[in-house]
């Protein structure tokens, strides 16, 4: 028996979040719900109180709140699963042709026939101006990252006067949808909020239906599609739209750019069109993900296909990409983690069997970490199915030892803690970390700092007062803990935790990284103050050790200038490079030794049998370039170990001031060092660090600053002259607060224009790079390429000196370029971009190519510091700028058409 509190509605409606993470959206629970789908349900209690349902009664239900939770690689994955086991794609059979269609499957059409539920367009008359100045953002507040729009939740929105789409209204609100992507704007200012109990008065002139908003939800329930054959729809979609057969749908594909799908309310009988590259590529991504979760049938929210690209990028980075880039060493994945794919060797297993030219599985443990050695040996004993070689490192690690194990590569152990579930078992738990890209398993140096900036952006206190995204805080903390471990056991923060990187560091960021993690910890979990102080103490002591024993010691410190250089330890040819990487370099030496085989030459050169001083110097600089993190660039090639670079000395200046600040603010300017190698119980105070920073500034001003050009140059300590190479690292003194206010002003006035391009800051200028060609190929850290860390450090530096508007402008340029590529090219996020191009900035013609391009159907990781640059960069933009970004407004148009008062915010 039906009561007056019931109303008839579609059974496919639910309170499920249309933007939920893939595991929940396509997981087992959704599969169970799909089994109950039918054309119509019985009746369901109305949410609008007692009384009969009138045709004028509002029928709108506000969209569910967007939740930010963690998304694993697959429904069965966990932190203990092997990181290399990404979601399998074997279920997706791409490009197999078009199968027969059934009810609910895709029907591909570009016809103009009537559709069930088409997109509304504006009722505003052509040429009629809105009452509100579109450039006036005085009512707009900076949107918090990953916050959900309160304007569409918890309250009722004024419905259409008729409560439904009647025939009398059809001519005004129905037309064929545009091929241009229509993005749902989840934070529309046009949303009208009222109290449900307040009498309603309607003003038709106030109601505007606009592309790119959820206004249509005022009249109808958000649309859902019923796809009863995921694989068949995938094949149909790819066969018709993927004309270049790369399993992606982009603006370069020449298909009809329209696909008809069955609606969920009709169980697939009625059809509705999906149009445009962006929505179709999103459909491809969603179908690919559903297939990897083993789904054969799904109900798909239209909102997931039409999601504002800024919101979609931010959501995927926060809930999916970080998870897929997370690694943690466990019992289950230790073999996959230890495997070295760059170097193959011959080895004998425990049964005496010889394995030739195969990948080995080895892990090295510090000489004084017996607990880790026994733990890994226990894993080896418990798992007879694995071949794991566990080795101790010697106490003294030098260039000769590093060279001696070049043919026995292995993973270097990192920080662990006792398993709280079995404290007496000897079982250990590793700290998690984020890798740069999907193909990596190692912890990298300055990548981790940039990733930390992005991770911490998501860690907040929600409106209810509870911390959210604490997992991201744990990841940031884990990377810092691993750095502390590396400094104490390997002497430095490593390029990466592989044996052939033992002599090589990367740009130092530990002090700022530790301070940001400390501040975020006490912000969201103030009850952990004591633990946070202990963490800050250990990080500071580690940074002091790194500073004194690595960066300000031989061979990296130049005594004459008092400045530091990238100058790693090592001998021979780097073993991790591709076998053919040095072909051109070695060719004349092979001829010199009677056309000796290249592998034989490398063997004899590395052993010292062949001595070539010129090659020794070349590989010294080659290792130094890799330590700088800028591998490779003509700025550094052939001279890096002799350069006192502006980037390194800016970071060391920041170390000096950060350490002084920490000692003064948290440790009463008196911190005892229990790690002092001389066992002298050394006491650290701020005085010496302030003196060091003062002296470094004097040295930088003398040797690196060029008053005439208004720029910082590197200084060649061997030639005793500036290099005059114009590099974006000239902005790093702003990040470190090393420049005076006059130097900063001159740098902005005379040099910024040399680096500002369509997509942000270029790594170096065309003038400095020079001509490139077959004999002088492009280098990836030179013009015309731009990198996320260069943007991030410049933004921070500009704000440090009050140039907020310029930082905002540069951030908009970089984020627009990323968003445009994401929309036009199937959700791509890559390692680096050509910032001078507006059309295809993600295509990079330089060594190593561009990571992040090679995916089938859906990108699942992006690239670590590029992901970070996006979510971090959004914090520099107000709501108006973020909306312009979502509508793909190019920087030139965005800045040119801006209200004069607003334009001041970008200067």
UniProtKB/Swiss-Prot annotation:
Enzyme Commission numbers on file: 3.2.1.28
**What's the protein name?**
Cytosolic neutral trehalase
For substrate, which residues are the binding ones? 439, 446-447, 495, 504-506, 576, 626, 629
Q: Which pathway does the UniProt entry assign to this protein?
A: Carbohydrate degradation
Biased-composition ranges, Basic and acidic residues, are: 125-144
In this protein, the active site sits at 631, 831
Which Pfam families does this UniProt record tie to the protein?
Trehalase (PF01204), Trehalase_Ca-bi (PF07492)
* Annotated residues for binding of Ca(2+): 242, 244, 246, 248, 253
Q: Where is this region: Disordered?
A: 1-20, 39-172
Q: Which GO terms describe its molecular function?
A: alpha,alpha-trehalase activity; calcium ion binding
Instruction: Respond yes or no to whether keyword Cytoplasm is given for this record.
Output: yes
Xref: SUPFAM superfamilies: Six-hairpin glycosidases (SSF48208)
Query: Which family does the similarity line name?
Result: Belongs to the glycosyl hydrolase 37 family.
Cofactor dependence is on: Ca(2+)
Reaction(s) the record says it catalyses = alpha,alpha-trehalose + H2O = alpha-D-glucose + beta-D-glucose
This protein's record includes keyword Calcium: yes
């Amino acid at each position: 028996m039906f009561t007056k509190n019931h109303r008839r509605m579609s059974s496919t409606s639910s309170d499920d979040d249309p933007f939920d993470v893939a595991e929940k959206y396509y997981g087992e629970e959704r599969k169970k719900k799909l089994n109950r789908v039918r054309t119509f349900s019985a009746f369901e209690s109305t949410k609008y109180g007692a009384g009969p349902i009138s045709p004028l009664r509002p029928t709108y239900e506000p969209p569910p709140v967007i939740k930010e939770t963690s998304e694993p690689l697959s429904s069965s994955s966990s932190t203990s699963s092997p990181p290399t086991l990404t979601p399998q794609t074997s279920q997706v059979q791409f490009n197999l042709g078009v199968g027969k269609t059934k009810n609910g499957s895709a029907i591909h059409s570009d016809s103009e026939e009537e559709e069930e539920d088409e997109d509304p367009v504006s009722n505003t008359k052509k040429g009629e101006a809105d009452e509100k100045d579109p450039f006036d953002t005085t009512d707009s507040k900076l949107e918090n990252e990953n916050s959900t729009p309160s304007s569409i939740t918890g309250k009722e929105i004024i419905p259409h006067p008729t409560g439904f789409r009647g025939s009398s209204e059809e001519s005004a609100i129905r037309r064929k949808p545009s091929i241009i992507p229509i993005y749902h704007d989840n934070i529309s200012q046009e949303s009208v909020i009222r109290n449900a109990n307040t009498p309603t008065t309607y003003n038709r002139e106030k109601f505007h239906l606009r592309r790119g908003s959820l206004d249509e939800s005022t009249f109808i329930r958000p649309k859902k599609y019923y796809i009863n054959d995921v694989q068949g729809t995938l094949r149909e979609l790819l066969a018709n739209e993927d004309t270049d057969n790369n399993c992606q749908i982009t603006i370069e594909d020449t298909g009809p750019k329209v696909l008809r799908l069955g609606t969920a309310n009709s169980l697939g009988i009625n059809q509705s069109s999906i149009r445009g590259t962006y929505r179709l590529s999103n459909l491809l991504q969603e179908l690919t993900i559903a297939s990897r979760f083993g789904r054969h049938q799904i109900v798909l929210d239209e909102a997931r296909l039409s999601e504002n690209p800024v919101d979609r990028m931010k959501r995927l980075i926060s809930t999916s990409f970080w998870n897929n880039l997370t690694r943690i060493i466990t019992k289950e994945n230790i073999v996959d983690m230890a495997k070295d794919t760059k170097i193959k060797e011959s080895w004998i297993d425990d049964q005496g069997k010889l394995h030739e030219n195969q990948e080995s599985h080895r892990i090295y443990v510090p000489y004084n970490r017996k607990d880790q050695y026994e733990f890994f040996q226990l894993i080896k004993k418990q798992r007879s199915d694995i071949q794991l070689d566990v080795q101790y490192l010697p106490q003294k690690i030098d260039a000769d030892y590093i060279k001696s194990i070049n043919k026995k590569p292995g993973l270097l152990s990192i920080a662990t803690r006792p398993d709280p579930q079995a404290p007496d078992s000897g079982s250990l738990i590793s700290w998690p970390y984020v890798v740069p890209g999907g193909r990596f398993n190692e912890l990298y140096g300055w990548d981790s700092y940039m990733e930390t900036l992005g991770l911490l952006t998501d860690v907040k206190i929600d409106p209810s007062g509870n911390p959210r995204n604490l997992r991201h805080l744990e990841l940031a903390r884990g990377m810092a803990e691993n750095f502390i471990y590396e400094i104490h056991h390997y002497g430095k923060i490593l390029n990466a935790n592989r044996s052939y990187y033992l002599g090589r560091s990367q740009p130092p960021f530990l002090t700022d990284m530790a301070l940001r993690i400390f501040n975020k910890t006490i912000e969201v979990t103030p009850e952990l103050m004591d633990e946070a102080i202990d963490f800050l103490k250990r990080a500071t002591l580690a940074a002091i050790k790194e500073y004194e024993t690595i960066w300000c010691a031989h061979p990296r410190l130049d005594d004459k200038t008092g400045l530091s250089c990238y100058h790693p330890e090592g001998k021979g040819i780097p073993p991790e490079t591709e076998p053919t990487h040095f072909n051109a370099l070695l060719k004349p030496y092979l001829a010199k030794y009677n056309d000796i085989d290249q592998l034989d030459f490398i063997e004899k050169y590395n052993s010292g049998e062949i001595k070539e001083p010129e090659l020794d110097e070349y590989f010294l600089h080659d290792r130094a370039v890799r330590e700088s993190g800028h591998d490779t660039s003509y700025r550094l090639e052939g001279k890096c170990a002799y350069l006192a670079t502006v980037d390194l000395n800016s970071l060391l200046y920041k170390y000096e001031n950060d350490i002084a600040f920490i000692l003064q603010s948290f440790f009463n300017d008196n911190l005892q060092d229990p790690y002092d190698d001389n066992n002298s119980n050394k006491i650290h105070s701020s005085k010496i660090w302030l003196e060091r920073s003062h002296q470094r500034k004097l040295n930088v001003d003398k040797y690196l600053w060029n008053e005439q050009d208004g720029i910082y140059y590197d200084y060649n300590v061997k030639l005793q002259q500036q290099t005059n190479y114009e590099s974006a690292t000239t902005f790093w003194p702003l990040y470190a607060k090393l420049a005076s206010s006059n130097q900063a002003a001159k740098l902005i006035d005379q040099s910024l224009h040399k680096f500002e391009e369509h997509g942000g800051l270029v790594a170096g200028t065309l003038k400095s790079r020079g001509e490139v060609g077959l004999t002088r190929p492009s280098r990836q850290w030179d013009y015309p390429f731009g990198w996320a860390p260069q943007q991030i450090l410049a933004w921070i530096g500009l704000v440090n000196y009050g140039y907020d508007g310029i930082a905002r402008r540069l951030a908009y340029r970089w984020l627009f370029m990323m968003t445009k590529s994401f929309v036009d090219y199937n959700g791509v996020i890559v390692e680096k971009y050509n910032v001078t191009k507006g059309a295809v900035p993600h295509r990079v013609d330089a060594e190593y190519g561009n990571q992040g391009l090679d995916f089938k159907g859906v990108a699942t990781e992006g690239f670590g510091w590029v992901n970070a640059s996006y979510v971090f960069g959004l914090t520099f933009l107000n709501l108006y700028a973020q909306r312009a970004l979502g509508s793909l407004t190019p920087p030139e148009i965005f800045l040119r058409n801006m209200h004069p008062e607003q334009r001041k915010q970008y200067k």
